[in-house]
């Protein structure tokens, strides 16, 4: 994703590994401040998940993978590290999946950094595929609505629900995005709007309760994330999804 800084626009990810440390955007500071924090031990990485420094299931998974990477590099007890990281967010399936994935990879003798980077890249590749498939749904001049944050901040880079929006914008299409504020944590107002602003994508923040009004008034497409998808296609998303 792009981020506007004092030194110009730069490409960043929500979380990555650099020089022996896990580096991430402190999402608690957005949209007022773009701050990067870094950690050199798995305990602090787990705390960054608990205190919502990092958010979004895929980004949480990647953060957990990098936490296990640190544990392996430092020679920590991997079983103890896995249990500690899993306890950081007991309801996050991606966290458990990432920890188990890294445990299996490390037991097979994989390089810790390469294994964690590969896990994060898999998330990005899936997001890019979502963008390719979803971009044709956004027509020239469309009005699009989204809720919560299913963008690059939540998925290491690119995003799920925001992937087609990014792809359409990069392809030169002109459209408008309604971003519902997403109470009580305000992820739409604080995170999704920030991401769109960095890309200069036209948008407006609306109250959650106004979603019905704007849908009646001519929204062409609603793109959402999905916390869970049932076999019959039903899905669950953030509270306030209309």
PLM-predicted stretches and their roles:
Residues 134-145, 168-172:
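Glycine-rich phosphate/diphosphate-binding loops that line cofactor/substrate pockets in enzymes
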Residues 66-76, 101-105, 159-172, 195, ...:
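A glycine- and small-aliphatic-rich helix-loop capping segment at beta-alpha/alpha-beta transitions
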Residues 25, 63, 67, 145-149, ...:
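Short beta-strand segments
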Residues 98-141:
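Small/polar-residue-rich loop-to-helix segments that shape phosphate-bearing ligand pockets
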Residues 13-107:
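Long amphipathic alpha-helical segments
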Residues 112, 123-130, 155-179, 186-190:
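Active-site histidine-anchored catalytic micro-motif
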Residues 174-175, 180-242:
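Conserved phosphate- and dinucleotide-binding cores of soluble alpha/beta proteins
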């Amino acid at each position: 994703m792009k981020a506007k800084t004092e030194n110009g626009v730069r490409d960043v990810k929500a979380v990555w590994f650099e020089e022996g440390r896990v580096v991430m955007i402190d999402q608690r500071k957005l949209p007022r401040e773009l701050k990067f924090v870094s950690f050199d031990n798995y305990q602090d990485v787990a705390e960054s998940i608990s205190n919502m420094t990092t958010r979004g299931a895929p980004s949480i998974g990647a953060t957990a993978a990098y936490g296990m990477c640190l544990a392996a590099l430092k020679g920590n007890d991997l079983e103890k590290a896995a249990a500690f990281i899993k306890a950081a967010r007991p309801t996050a399936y991606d966290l458990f999946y990432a920890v188990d994935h890294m445990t299996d990879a490390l037991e097979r003798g994989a390089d810790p950094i390469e294994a964690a980077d590969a896990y994060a890249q898999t998330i990005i590749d899936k997001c890019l595929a979502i963008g390719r498939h979803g971009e044709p749904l956004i027509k020239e001049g469309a009005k699009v609505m989204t809720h919560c944050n299913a963008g690059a901040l939540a998925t290491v880079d690119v995003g799920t629900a925001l992937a087609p929006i990014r792809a359409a914008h990069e392809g030169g299409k002109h459209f408008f995005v309604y971003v519902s504020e997403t109470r009580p944590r305000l992820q739409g107002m604080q995170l999704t709007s920030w991401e769109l602003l960095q890309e200069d994508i036209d948008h407006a923040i609306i109250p959650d309760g106004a979603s019905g009004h704007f849908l009646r008034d001519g929204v062409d497409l609603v793109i959402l994330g999905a916390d869970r998808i049932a076999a019959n296609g039903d899905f669950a998303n953030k509270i306030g999804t209309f």
